[in-house]
Design a protein with these regions (language model features):
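PAPS-dependent sulfotransferase catalytic core
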Residues: 1-88, 208-225
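Mid-core helix/loop region of P-loop NTP-binding domains shared across ATPases and GTPases
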Residues: 89-94
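PAPS-dependent sulfotransferase catalytic domain
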Residues: 95-206
């Protein structure tokens, strides 16, 4: 199984990552900033070169005519490129850990300011991994905005609120698929069963006692520092 812990910065998703890593059958690697975004952009650029660009800008010049700026784009095998990208990601990014069930922490898919791009990136992940488990995590915008990464950013409350609501709406609408979990930091940080029970239900052999210890550490990067 493949999974991703999808959230936004300073929601406690590193605690979820550590909780998952107490199990003996699931492993979660840390975030790789913008990797999924750039992989998606690569594939989307090839699709655009093959379809929308010729149709909108050069409708009268065939793609097998070298007067066309996207000459021979129609011969690009998109499915093969996707398969190569997927294989490279599995082997060289996820493959750094040895586990039958591997996932990653993802904080860089943002509905702010463009929800359509975020939805497309989620769809891209589901293209790579059709049965992927999305573990979604949210946190109260006011509390989240006090942490160091947010408090000096303009419009941080609006961005956090937007991203939080996008996750909730996506969970309800099904863009993350039927196989997803919605967690709320403001609940599970006070009651660890709100974190433990959904992970166990997903098949993770986690150590509940260790998770209690991890949560109680109060990681500094999600505090008010």
């Amino acid at each position: 199984m493949y999974f991703t812990v999808l959230s936004y910065p300073r929601t406690g998703s590193t605690v979820i990552q550590r909780a998952i890593n107490t199990s003996n059958n699931f492993k979660c690697i840390g975030e790789k900033p913008m990797v999924i975004n750039h992989m998606h952009a690569l594939i989307q650029s090839l699709i655009d070169a093959k379809t929308s660009i010729p149709e909108s800008l050069f409708p009268d010049i065939p793609m097998n005519d070298d007067r066309n700026p996207v000459f021979m784009a129609h011969e690009v095998d998109i499915d093969s490129v996707i398969n190569y990208v997927k294989a490279a990601y599995i082997r060289h990014v996820l493959g750094v850990v040895d586990s039958p069930n591997i996932g990653w922490k993802e904080n860089f898919i943002s509905s702010y300011p463009d929800e359509k791009v975020a939805n497309s990136e989620v769809a891209f992940i589901r293209t790579l991994f059709p049965d992927i488990l999305f573990i979604l995590n949210i946190r109260d915008p006011e509390e989240c905005s006090r942490s160091s990464i947010w408090k000096f950013r303009d419009d941080s409350i609006n961005e956090i609120t937007n991203r939080r609501q996008w996750i909730i709406n996506g969970f309800n609408s099904g863009i993350f698929g039927d196989n997803c979990i919605l967690l709320d930091y403001d609940e599970w940080s006070k009651d660890s069963s709100k974190l433990i029970n959904p992970l166990v239900a997903a098949g993770m052999n986690i150590n509940a006692q260790t998770i209690e210890s991890v949560i109680s550490e109060k990681l500094t990067h999600i505090s008010n520092i």
